[in-house]
Amino acid sequence: MATIKDVAKLAGVSTTTVSHVINKTRFVAEETSKTVWNAVQKLNYSPSAVARSLKINTTKSIGMIITTSEAPYFAEIVLAVEEHCYQQGYSLFLCNTQNEPEKIQNHLDMLIKKRVDGILVMCSEYTRNSLELFNATNIPMVVMDWGKAHEKNDRIIDNSFNGAYLATRHLIDNGHKDIGVISGYLTKTICSERLEGFIKAMKEANLPIREEWILEGDFEPESGFEQMNNLLRLDKLPTAIFCFSDTIALGVLSALSEKGIAVPQDISIIGYDNTHSSRFFSPPLTTIHQSKSRLGVKALNLLLERIKLGHKEYQPHTIEFHPELVLRHSVRNLNKSEE
């Protein structure tokens, strides 16, 4: 395997000159530079990435720790981050944790050994232990938190309350008075805020809120499927269901399809997140849009800013998003039915 000394000997220059040409750290005459590159190609010389990173104090790599990249919501954020990393000349190490402290610790250790320039942390929830692990490292880091503000964490404000209010108002405006909910874990801030938005819209319209129609899932299709079947066992069904995620709605649609119940003819469904696949559901899902790509890009830009600052003190940032209603074909207008 060729070394930098071999390149220097063939090009008739010093190893220092070869280093400056390859790393572009100093001006080198065009003719000399061309001679060096010809020698590099002839010898098939490949500089050691580790050696270069030690010399210029950067590996041009980013670590990303997330709950799971399988969930459509996180998958779309990861895609945006990876694409933006590529555009900025960075490689991305992706680490799934399933919110397990041991995995978080192991992934952190691995990223530190890889000498990544920075770490982007984006989990659906944090334990005190995981936050302590993140805060203990000196690597530039952006910790995105959907929950209450923490001293060192950057916060995402997705206005879940407003999004849920918007979704519920859409159902009410389409003549629905009996509305059910299938949520994620209500201990999570985003879910409790969405439930509050639902309740506000219902109370403003003087509509009854039936506790047996408020069911708790876990954001996965399986829980949507299971809770929809639980609803179907009741004597009276709602005319519409507000699902707190598109993945929950997918499970709900599957359960209804198995029972031969048509959407939206027999029951209306509205989702949340506007994941890429929601437009291909049967029927295409009316939902609440959140810009996952914009979130990913903003979070990465924030991290790149931290990397430039080095160890200087910085203030936590807030990234705020405003939900929008996306109209498709899963909600029936009952007002037209009565005309």
Swiss-Prot record:
Which SUPFAM superfamilies does the UniProt entry name for this protein? lambda repressor-like DNA-binding domains, Periplasmic binding protein-like I
Biochemical pathway:
Purine metabolism; purine nucleotide biosynthesis [regulation]
Highest taxon of the lineage: Bacteria
Q: How does it assemble?
A: Homodimer.
Q: What does this protein do?
A: Is the main repressor of the genes involved in the de novo synthesis of purine nucleotides, regulating purB, purC, purEK, purF, purHD, purL, purMN and guaBA expression. PurR is allosterically activated to bind its cognate DNA by binding the purine corepressors, hypoxanthine or guanine, thereby effecting transcription repression.
PROSITE patterns with a match to the protein in the record: HTH_LACI_1, HTH_LACI_2
Q: What is the lineage of its organism?
A: Bacteria, Pseudomonadati, Pseudomonadota, Gammaproteobacteria, Pasteurellales
Q: Name one GO molecular function term.
A: transcription cis-regulatory region binding
| Domain text | Consists of two structural and functional domains: an N-terminal DNA-binding domain, approximately the first 60 residues, and a larger C-terminal domain, approximately 280 residues, which imparts the function of corepressor binding and oligomerization.
Binding residues for hypoxanthine? 73, 188, 219, 273
Q: Which HAMAP family has this protein been placed in?
A: HTH_type_PurR (MF_01277)
Annotated DNA-binding ranges? 4-23, 48-56
Span of domain HTH lacI-type = 2-56
Name any Gene Ontology BP term: purine nucleotide biosynthetic process
Swiss-Prot/TrEMBL keywords = DNA-binding, Purine biosynthesis, Repressor, Transcription, Transcription regulation
Give the protein's recorded name: HTH-type transcriptional repressor PurR
Q: Which InterPro entries match?
A: HTH_LacI, LacI/GalR-like_sensor, Lambda_DNA-bd_dom_sf, Peripla_BP_I, Tscrpt_reg_HTH_PurR
Q: Which NCBIfam families match?
A: PRK10703.1
Q: Which Pfam families match?
A: LacI, Peripla_BP_3
